[in-house]
Amino acid sequence: MRLGLDPVLQDAIRLGTTVLATAGDDLSSERMQAGRVYVNYPASSPYVLGCGGTRIALDGARGSIVNETVWNDDGVHSTGGGISEEYQVPAFQAAARIPGSLNDGRRGRGVPDVAAAAAPTNGYRIFLNGVDFVASGTSAVAPLWGAFIALINARRGQSLGFVNDRLYQLPNLLRPIVTGDNKDTTGLGYNAAPRLERLHRGLGSPDGGAIVTALTTIA
C-alpha cells in the first residue's frame, strides 16, 4: 500500500493539495499484543500531516482550557503515535529531537505532526441525517485540522499545499503537550516530553485563531 499510495501523495503536493490523516485510536501498540510499537499509515508518510489526539480539561465557568494531556483511556483506547521504521526523519523534522523507536532504537519519521482534543469526553457535536450525536477520536481531529486549512486557503485565495514544513517553523502557534502517554495496559508506549520531542501529539494542539492568521499571511 505504501509504495502505491506515496506517489499519489506526492502528486497531491505538486497540485497544491494538503493531505491529512489520523494517527489512530489504538495506542502505540495498535492493540496487537505483539510486544512491539507501530505507527499508522498514511499518517506516517512524510507527505501527509499526521493528526493525533489529546484530552482537555475546561474551566467550568469560562469554558477555557486549563489543562491538556495526551489522550489515553486507561491503556485501552488512546492516540496512536511513535516512530516510523519505514521512513527516515524528514527535513521538516530535522530540528526536532526525535527519539529512537522503542523497537530497535532507530530514529525515523515522528508521528503525528499535530493534535487536538480527541477524548470521548471532549467530543464534537455532529448533526447528520437528522441525528444529533458526539464524535471523537483522531478521526475527528483530522477533519478539524482540515477545516483550519480550508479556512486559511479561502482567506489566502490560494492553497497552502504541503503545510508540514511551515508548521514546524511556527511551533509557538501550538500548545505543547508535555504530560501523558499512549501506553497500553502492559506499559508499552511513549511518554509525552517537552517541546521538540514530539511523539503522539506532534507539535501540539492548535491555537486556531493564531494559526489561521499566521498561515493566511505567510508566503
Predicted regions and their residues:
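Extracellular protease catalytic domains of secreted zymogens
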Residues: 1-219
